[in-house]
Amino acid sequence: SVGNVSVPYIAIQDIPDLYSRGCAAQTISPNGDYKLDAVASILVHEIDESLTDPDLATWFDARGAENADKCAWAFGTSTTLSNGAKWNYQAPGTLTKYYIQMNWLADNKVTDPVTGSACVVTK
């Protein structure tokens, strides 16, 4: 906090280190940059948690997991391109495809159409 104002933030490890430590789900990419894919997937996970648990003590399940942790490294329904890269999200208004891990939604009306899980790719 700064004075009496709470300042939300997220912390993520050294970005060049993400893909060298196995944080990329695949070493080929649907958009030509698997390093960017690793960063994007992890950032989506952390941003989702910063929105739903900004004080780091708001919501945990019985195992101590935040919402995105419940679906970590689960990617759901995907499409495989001719180069072997999988993708499950296309950025709005672009042709750019990404392979993004899913996040858990408490709304039981929203589920992955294939698995029926509350883990979905956040749009």
List where the protein language model places each region:
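Metalloprotease/metallohydrolase-associated module, dominated by Zn2+-dependent proteases
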Residues: 1-37, 53-123
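Short alpha-helix carrying the canonical HExxH Zn2+-binding catalytic motif
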Residues: 35-48
